[in-house]
Amino acid sequence: MVQLCLIGTKKVSLNMIKERIQTKGDDLKMLQGHDRLAYLIDIAKHVESLPQEVKTETNRIRGCASNLWLIGGAKEDNTMIYKIDADAFITKGTAKLITDLVNGCPKDEVAALTLEDFIPLGIRELLTMQRQNGLGSLIQRIVDIANTK
């Protein structure tokens, strides 16, 4: 399910990542609200669980309605890779969708993303306020990891 941003040796720009987000948002908008949630739940069912030893407070995303953990870093080629786990399907599916959009993308491009760049996904309006806060915290942590590793 992960679609890498790099094809061959082609460098991916920030605009290309934003286009991927827009395209995924357009695809999701074809689904009605309940069907979008069902899609997120289906994604979550295919996420491999993180080992217990990385489910620490340091890796937990604060502000979520449920427990969400994110680990990540830059690979040798300076592209980012993230893995998530959560104890609720909607949270897990949402986080997996977000990380799939940035996995394999250049570190500097991921570091330049903002919460507003993800608005075209159209997910925020499906989430409770607390889950929206968690989504913002997840995106900020993704960017922070890209800025530090």
Where are the predicted features?
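Amphipathic alpha-helical interface surfaces
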Residues: R36, I90-T94, P106, T114, ...
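A general alpha-helix detector
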Residues: T23-K24, T94-L97
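Short acidic alpha-helix initiation/capping motifs at coil-to-helix transition points
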Residues: M16-E19, F89-G93
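N-terminal amphipathic/basic-hydrophobic helices that include classical n-h-c signal peptides
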Residues: M1-N15
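Solvent-exposed interaction patches of small proteins and small membrane subunits
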Residues: T58-C64, Y82-A86, D108-L113
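Conserved interaction-surface patches within small, structured recognition/assembly domains
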Residues: K75-F89, T99-N103
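Glycine-rich phosphate/pyrophosphate-binding loops
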Residues: G104-L121
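N-terminal intrinsically disordered, cationic/polar leader segments
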Residues: L14-N67, A74-D77, E116-K149
